[in-house]
Each structure stands twice: as C-alpha cells, then as structure tokens.
C-alpha cells in the first residue's frame, strides 16, 4: 500500500483540472465580453 504515490497523483490531477477549468472560464468570459 503506497498511499504517498496516490496522494501525489491526486494532487497533480486536481491541480490540472483546476487550471483547465480556469482556462475554459476565462475563454468563455472573453468571448462573452468581446
């Protein structure tokens, strides 16, 4: 049971999805205001 690897993978995946969500929201806002 290597929980450290699971935690690191979870953090990387969650941060990746957070960045992707911010990019999508910013693009939607730019297209809406533009």
From Swiss-Prot:
Keywords: Membrane, Transmembrane, Transmembrane helix. It is found in: Membrane. One of its GO terms (cellular component) is membrane. The chain crosses the membrane at residues 10-30. InterPro entries: YoaI-like. It comes from the Bacteria. It is a single-pass membrane protein. NCBIfam families: membrane_YoaI. This is Uncharacterized protein YoaI. It comes from Escherichia coli O6:H1 (strain CFT073 / ATCC 700928 / UPEC). The gene is yoaI.
């Amino acid at each position: 049971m290597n929980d450290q690897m699971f935690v690191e993978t979870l953090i990387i995946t969650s941060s990746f999805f957070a960045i992707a969500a911010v990019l999508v929201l910013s693009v939607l806002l730019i297209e809406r205001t533009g």
